[in-house]
Every structure is written in C-alpha cells, then in structure tokens.
C-alpha cells in the first residue's frame, strides 16, 4: 500500500484506527455520497463495499477478532479499507485541478483498491472455513461485481480542453463553467485562485 502514501497524512489513517471493517465501509459509503469528482467511481466503489459489508455482518466480523489466526487477515482488510476511505475522501477535499490532472491515476487506484479489498476478504473467508451455501453465493456475487472504473466524461472534456485546446473553443469558458458549479457563490477569479492554492499544496505534497 506504500504507493498510496500521497493520498493523505498518516494522521488521517490514525484517526480511523480502532474501527472494524463494517464501520469503515459505512464511512466510505457516507463519504462517497458527497464527493465532487469521480462521483461515479466513488459510488460504484461504495456499492461494491456495501455488498462486502453485508457479508461481514453475517459473519459477525467483530467476533472473529477473538481468534488469533483471524487477527492478521482482518487487520489487512481493515488497512485496505482505510486507504479506500482516503481515496474516496480525496475526491472531496483535493484540488479540482489536481484531480483532473491525475484522472487516470485515480481510476487505477480505484481498481487497485477494490482488488486488494476483495483479496483480503477472500483470505478471511478461507480461514474461517465457512461451509454455508448462502455465504458462498454472496461471495460469488461480489466476485462477479467487477466494476468498470473510468474517468468521468465531463471531467475528461475539461481536461482535453485545457491540455489540447480546440482553436474554436476557449478553454477558459470550459473551466469557468466547471468552477461555477464547484463554487457557486464565488466569482470566477476567486474560485480559480482557491483552486490554484489547493493545486500548489498538492504539488508540494507530491
């Protein structure tokens, strides 16, 4: 998970320590409903995790921690979910211009996050040796739910307009339209200044 270090400060991870997998999934679902960018990806990710949360509730996941052999795989699953939360939360708090520039990289991180969470879930289930037809069916349904993450079409249009401007189209108009939606109460110059300041912070972190 080291490649995700630039998603947030370690203090953000520390704040999530102590929450079990079901509670972490609830946080992700809540955060996904308020994101500004990658809305479709965030909500697909959250919907997939809701399937997992339902299965974990059936397993009484908080009780599984009592067993020594379950602690490490559960901790790995929870760690992957914490990073998943930071990924979703970054689509709310980060600079619009930064997220736009990193569009396909963020898409890749959603794919990686889902893959890692599913792998750790599978490990937890293998260790429990659950012989229950309903749970097996739920797991198969989760595995079939392979979400297609992609760069939102509207955001891609803005990125294309800025990086490869059409002589017939003024990129400023495209950007102005988008920023007016993100900052409905601010004049364009102030909104652009706010995004520029956020972008500077992101570049310093990178």
Question: At which residue positions do the language-model features occur?
Answer:
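Alpha-helical bundle protein-protein interaction modules that mediate dimerization/oligomerization
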Residues: 71-204
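N-terminal amphipathic alpha-helical segments
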Residues: 1-66, 99-102, 112, 120-142, ...
